[in-house]
């Protein structure tokens, strides 16, 4: 979704009203996108107590980054980063997620590692 240039609202409206044939063709940016998920303590086997998440605003100050917040437990949020290369997008995603604080949380450190080499 981070790479979608065409209006998602228009595409969904056309699809829901049976007029997808007259919808504009979906256009995507040539940039690469990387998403890293921040999970709460114990995920996926147990549910952690609700804790405060901080640093989202700081994370979103990283160029090309958007934070998609979901909840305070389980898969808490996703950090989506775009860049001209996978290496750049990956670097931005991990720079941003390092700014987010949630006691006991964790995230994978190998997302897009192979394609970013």
Regions found by a protein language model. Give the residues of each.
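Active-site "cap" helix and flanking loop/linker of ATP-utilizing ligase/carboxylase catalytic domains
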Residues: 1-64, 68-70
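Generic C-terminus detector
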Residues: 72-117
């Amino acid at each position: 979704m981070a790479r979608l240039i065409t209006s998602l609202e228009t595409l969904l409206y056309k699809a829901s009203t049976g007029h997808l044939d007259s919808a504009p063709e979906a256009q995507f940016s040539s940039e690469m996108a990387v998403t890293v998920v921040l999970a709460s303590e114990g995920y996926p086997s147990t549910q952690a107590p609700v804790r405060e998440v901080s640093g989202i605003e700081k994370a979103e100050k990283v160029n090309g980054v958007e934070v998609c917040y979901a909840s305070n437990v389980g898969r808490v949020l996703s950090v989506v980063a775009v860049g001209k290369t996978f290496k750049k997008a990956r670097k931005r995603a991990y720079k941003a997620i390092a700014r987010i604080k949630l006691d006991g949380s964790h995230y994978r450190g190998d997302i897009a590692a192979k394609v970013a080499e």
